[in-house]
């Protein structure tokens, strides 16, 4: 996962790495294991990561995992389809939470 794009190096980022070097190492080891072939192949895992990166709105994750998905053989169409799945899930959650707003309105209106 060495070629996953990360935020540009800065003094603050360097200090974060120094302050938690063992945590950095553990996270990189976790990433290496998680993104290895397993029950899901690397391409599928990268497509999942593309979708999640869009839901979490992490620009570095989007860049890194789009590159990772392409490296693992994903097509533009597959990458965009993963993004559309993420968009539907995010919109679906907002739609589902409308029930909370309706419950609050019922409380306000005394229903």
UniProtKB/Swiss-Prot annotation:
Alphabetized Pfam families for the sequence: CMD
GO MF terms held by the record: peroxiredoxin activity
Annotated protein name in UniProt: Uncharacterized protein 4 in cox locus
């Amino acid at each position: 996962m060495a070629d996953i794009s990360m935020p540009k190096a800065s003094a603050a980022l360097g200090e974060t790495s120094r302050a938690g070097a063992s945590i950095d190492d553990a996270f990189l080891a976790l990433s290496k294991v998680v993104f290895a072939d397993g029950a899901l192949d690397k391409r599928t895992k990268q497509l999942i990561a593309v979708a999640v990166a869009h839901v979490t709105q992490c620009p570095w994750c989007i860049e890194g995992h789009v590159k990772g998905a392409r490296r693992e053989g994903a097509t533009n169409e597959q990458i965009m389809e993963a993004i559309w799945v993420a968009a539907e899930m995010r919109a679906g959650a907002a739609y589902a939470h409308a029930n909370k707003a309706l419950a609050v309105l019922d409380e306000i209106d005394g229903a």
